[in-house]
A protein has these predicted regions:
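Subtilisin-like serine protease catalytic core
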Residues: 6-9, 26, 40-42, 55-57, ...
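Noncatalytic accessory or regulatory domains flanking protease catalytic cores in secreted, cell-surface
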Residues: 18-23, 127-188
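Secreted peptidase-domain scaffold signal
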Residues: 39-40, 55-110, 338-344
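Acidic, Ser/Thr/Pro-rich low-complexity intrinsically disordered segments
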Residues: 84, 94-98, 104-133, 331-332
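Catalytic-core environment of secreted peptidases
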Residues: 120-128, 229-282, 318, 340
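Edge beta-strands of jelly-roll/beta-sandwich modules across compartments, strongly enriched
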Residues: 186-197
Length: 344
């Protein structure tokens, strides 16, 4: 970005990476930083939507609204829980795993109790707000739970869980669960994200996954172009492509581009076929560069960058077969079309 400013030239930035850590609502420090870059100079930032669409690494639960606290003669009894309205989130931990993280994100106004339950039935309680605790699982393996607080950048609250295997052993495999006991619920929505596919095995995942809001961060940032992948020969969105919308309801992905079995330059020379949204995003980054060249460099529209360029790409996107309502959680506004994106 600094070099583009020094050269007084527009710049298209491609970010073909992402992870699951954060509230996915555009409000984390990282998401805000990426969004703010939009106003630094004449640029367009393009971000891959991630490959978590069918990875079973996201789920969502809705807790019943109301006051479920237990009261005694002396008032509210914080040591007791009401199990009548409890919710369990189950997930499979595959053989051979050495590390796993799960984040639960919820509204700070909601109060609940959380227990992690092992395959053997052992229960591990969430600590007090603003603190953390580490439990021993055997073989020097540990489970850490951190009960977070809001930050200056987000009103959401995180409960962070991390499993770490001891030296020479793996984590206890089987069906684990996260038991949620509501105390005082006003909004009730809890989103849980697991480590991304690079960090966990393919057999590890939630038993009741939710494919929506599986975009990786920073594809959830506000003022960027987020790109999913579709298969060119079938004209269908790729199953792995990260789905929207964001946790705050913002439209993402913006659009989709070819991302299955794409012939591309290989490290060390030559060519190879690659699949993923990180392959789809460069198509859109190139399109963004062409739009800014047409507008800024050639003098047709010196303000064609940032959100204006994004708007042109959205309008120019073509529909995909079988999808009638746009924006769509998987395809956004449709598939990339550079020709239709250039204003006539």
């Amino acid at each position: 970005m600094r070099k583009a400013i020094r050269l007084q030239q527009p710049i298209a930035v491609n970010l073909s990476f992402g992870n699951n850590y954060g509230p996915h609502d555009g409000r984390s420090l990282f998401e805000n930083y990426i969004s703010e870059l939009n106003g630094v100079w004449k640029n367009m930032i393009v971000v891959a939507a991630g490959n978590e669409g069918n990875a079973r690494h996201h789920t969502q639960v809705a807790l019943p609204k109301g006051d479920f606290r237990i009261y005694g003669n002396g008032g509210f009894d914080g040591s007791r829980i009401n199990s009548d309205n409890s919710t369990e989130v189950e997930f499979a931990l595959a053989e051979g795993e050495r590390a796993l993280t799960i984040q639960l994100w919820k509204s700070y106004v909601d109060r609940l109790e959380l227990y992690v339950v092992s395959p053997s039935g052992e229960r591990f309680r969430m600590p007090e707000e603003g603190t953390g605790v580490r439990y021993m699982l055997g073989g020097d393996s540990t489970l850490s739970i951190v009960h977070g607080t809001p930050t200056p950048y987000t009103i959401s609250q995180e409960i962070y869980m991390e499993w770490t295997a001891g030296e020479g052993v793996t984590l206890p495999a089987g069906i684990w669960s996260i038991a949620l006991y509501p105390r005082e619920i006003r909004e009730g929505v809890c989103n849980l994200w697991m480590s991304g596919i690079e960090a966990s095995g393919s057999q590890t995942g939630f038993l009741m996954p939710v494919t929506n809001t599986t975009l990786t961060i920073p594809a959830t940032a506000d003022r960027i172009v987020s790109v999913g992948a579709y298969q060119a020969d079938t004209m269908a969105v790729a199953p792995f492509s990260g789905r929207g919308f964001t946790a705050s309801g913002q439209t993402a992905p913006t659009l989709v581009a070819p991302g299955v079995d794409i012939l591309t330059a290989a490290p060390g020379g030559g060519y190879a076929r690659r699949t993923g949204t990180s392959i789809a995003a460069p198509f859109v980054t190139g399109a963004a560069a062409l739009l800014m060249e047409w507008g800024i460099v050639r003098g047709n529209d010196v303000e064609l960058y940032g959100e204006k360029g994004k708007a042109y790409l959205m309008r120019g996107a073509k529909p995909l077969p079988g999808i009638t309502d746009y924006p769509d959680v998987a395809a956004g506004y449709g598939r990339l079309c550079v020709e239709q994106s250039i204003p006539k």
